[in-house]
Every structure is written in C-alpha cells, then in structure tokens.
C-alpha cells in the first residue's frame, strides 16, 4: 500500500486557521495552537451573541418607545396595552423607528392608544 503524505493538507489547514485569526493580537494571530484555540472561542461567542443580539435590540426598542411614550404622557405598558385594544398591529422595531424619526406619527399613535384605554377601563369596571 502506498504511503499517504499529509503535509499539504496539514499546511493548508494551518494556513486557513492563521488567516482566519489574522486580526487577533499577539500570539493568537501568529502561533497555530493559540490561533486555533482562539478561533474555537471566537466561533462560540459569535454563535451565542447572534442569538443574544435579538434580545438586545428588543430591549433597545422598548427603551426608545418608553422614552417617547412618556414624553407624550403615557407609560410603555399603557401605550402597548392601548395599541393592542385599538387593534393596531405595529411591531416594536417600527414603533421605535417612529419614535426616533417621526415624532408626529408616534404622537398620533399615542393618541390612538390613549383613546382605546378609557373604553377598556369602563368595560372592565362594569
């Protein structure tokens, strides 16, 4: 049976790892073993943080909506409740964008939510 020489494959694998780690600091970009270890950690962080990013953005949107709603005299909780009762189906991403870039449209939505709230309070009290 012929002997299998693996030098080409090994060199290619090492080169790919070192190229992927090229932006890292110190030994992590120059030594294969350190670079490989750092790449494993980096991939783990990337995977984890791609999922965490979704929650981070939702939190940012809620903070922006709350600030704009309070500026219009309503808390976030009451604002979202009023929108739900009024049948307005706008997601938090769009609401946050309106709050930042189009204050007049957001104020109109606050009024829609405010108008829907007292009607709900009267029906629940009866």
Curated annotation (Swiss-Prot):
GO terms for cellular component: ribonucleoprotein complex; ribosome. Keywords: Ribonucleoprotein, Ribosomal protein, RNA-binding, rRNA-binding. It holds the Pfam family Ribosomal_L20. Transmembrane segments: none annotated. One of its GO terms (biological process) is translation. GO terms for molecular function: rRNA binding; structural constituent of ribosome. InterPro entries: Ribosomal_bL20 (IPR005813), RIBOSOMAL_L20_CS (IPR049946), Ribosomal_protein_bL20_C (IPR035566). Binds directly to 23S ribosomal RNA and is necessary for the in vitro assembly process of the 50S ribosomal subunit. It is not involved in the protein synthesizing functions of that subunit. Belongs to the bacterial ribosomal protein bL20 family. HAMAP family: Ribosomal_bL20. NCBIfam families: rplT_bact (TIGR01032). This is Large ribosomal subunit protein bL20.
